[in-house]
Structures are given as structure tokens and as C-alpha cells.
Amino acid sequence: LALDLCAGTGCVAISLAAARPTGFVFATDLSRDAVTLARENAARLGAYNLSVREGDLFAPLADARHPLELGAPLRFDLITANPPYIATGEIAGLMSDVRDFEPRLALDGGADGLELMRRLVAEAPKHLAPGGVLAVEVGAGEAPDVRALFADAGFGDIELHRDYARIERVVSGVLST
């Protein structure tokens, strides 16, 4: 069972659903337009083991039930997220192809870029199964701070993953049992 937060167009959630056709994926996003697009993309690509919901982080799951095990608690083996992580003051300086075409909601991570990240990492343990993994995309230079958030929230085996430009771009960790 997987969950993709801040799912945007659904590319990560759809990829997870395709990789595990006998599993199930939930995805959430605050943007109604993003949710609509993710649902359209999922239908177009045949990702029928995916439920896309509108709302803030984990809130859309309040009434969700485990889709594979009747009566089982809704705890995820994997949670992924690509939250807004750009500091508010840096948005004006972004390249125009990002600044002018991406919704501000998808970019603005607050004063230091980590506003939503703090809440996401702190809340994730309540939604993960024991030994579950959290993996989040981060902005350039944010990985050490996010690693500390993971440690404070009780994650172990914390790893920083670099992108093709060798920038630490993803932080992952395993929920300590």
C-alpha cells in the first residue's frame, strides 16, 4: 500500500501503481486542477489501482478504508512526496519556464522552503506501517535540514539520493519500529 502526497499530475503515483499492479496507491493534492489532471492521466494509462483525492496532505484519507484487506488499518508501506520546497523570496528569481508556468501553490514552500515539509515529516509516522519508508523530494541545499527532520520524527536508515546533476534531491528513511 503506497501514498503519494502533493501528487501533481500523478506521475509518481501512476508509476507506483504500474509497478505494483496487485497493490493499491492513494494520491493527494491540494489543487483541484492537479487532482483532475492526475485522475485523467491515471484513466488514460489504465492505473485502476489508484485513488486520487483532493485536500491537504493526509486529510483526504480521513474516511478512506484499506482497499485490499477488509477492516485493516490504513497504514502505508511507502509514502512519497514532492511538496513545494522553494523559499517564497526565491520564486521571483526562478527561470521563467518554471516561474511562469508552474502554479505558485506547487512551488512556494514558505519563508525557508520547508514549511510544508516540517508538517509532512512530523505527521508521516502516524500513517506508515512499522518499517514503512518515507521518501521526499527536496530543494538544492535542503537535504541536511530535512534529514534532521526525519531523525527527529523517528526515522532510521536515512539516506540522501542525488539527481543527475549530483544535487541531493531526495531524502528517504525507514520508520523505526
Stretches with model-predicted labels:
Residues 51-53, 105, 159:
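Structural signal for short hydrophobic segments within the conserved structured cores
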